[in-house]
């Protein structure tokens, strides 16, 4: 049973499909190098140009564990990898601004916070 599983065609198909998804895109006029890409996506990612050694292949071959070894924080890592995937798919590359909490806090505690605020307003009158 184990022998049959090791040599089944599904394992070969899975390996082939993963390699085809990991294609390297050629630099364009808009984004000629890694520095331009990291500057274009924003969120102070251009600080990591030295980490990538300004090599285009490093941008597409390095994954999360490698970037973690290089000392890139998790939020930046996820953002960069997300933008690299968008570049692979041919989507437009632009900065995605960080979200901002509302005055009343996050969505889980918003109702509670609004109720307390309204109670304080009533008591102040």
From Swiss-Prot:
Concerning Pfam families, the annotation shows:
SAM_Ribosomal_mS41
* Record-linked InterPro entries: Ribosomal_mS41, SAM_Ribosomal_mS41
Mind telling me where the transit peptide is?
Answer: 1-23
What keywords are assigned to this protein?
Answer: Mitochondrion, Ribonucleoprotein, Ribosomal protein, Transit peptide
Q: Give the family from UniProt.
A: Belongs to the mitochondrion-specific ribosomal protein mS41 family.
Q: What is its main location?
A: mitochondrion
Q: What is the documented function of this protein?
A: Involved in telomere length regulation.
**What name does this protein carry?**
Small ribosomal subunit protein mS41
GO CC, sorted alphabetically, is: mitochondrion; ribonucleoprotein complex; ribosome
Name its species. Kluyveromyces lactis (strain ATCC 8585 / CBS 2359 / DSM 70799 / NBRC 1267 / NRRL Y-1140 / WM37)
Give compartment(s).
Mitochondrion
Q: Which SMART domains match?
A: IGR
């Amino acid at each position: 049973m184990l022998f049959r599983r090791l040599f089944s065609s599904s394992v070969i198909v899975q390996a082939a499909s993963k390699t085809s998804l990991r294609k390297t895109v050629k630099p364009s006029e808009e984004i000629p190098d890694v520095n331009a890409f990291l500057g274009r996506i924003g969120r102070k990612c251009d600080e990591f140009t030295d980490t990538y050694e300004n090599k285009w292949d490093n941008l597409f071959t390095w994954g999360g564990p490698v970037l973690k070894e290089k000392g890139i924080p998790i939020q930046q890592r996820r953002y960069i990898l997300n933008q690299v995937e968008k570049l692979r798919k041919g989507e437009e590359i632009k900065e995605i601004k960080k979200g901002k909490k509302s005055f009343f806090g996050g969505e889980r505690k918003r109702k509670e916070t609004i109720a307390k605020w309204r109670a304080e307003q009533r008591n102040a009158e």
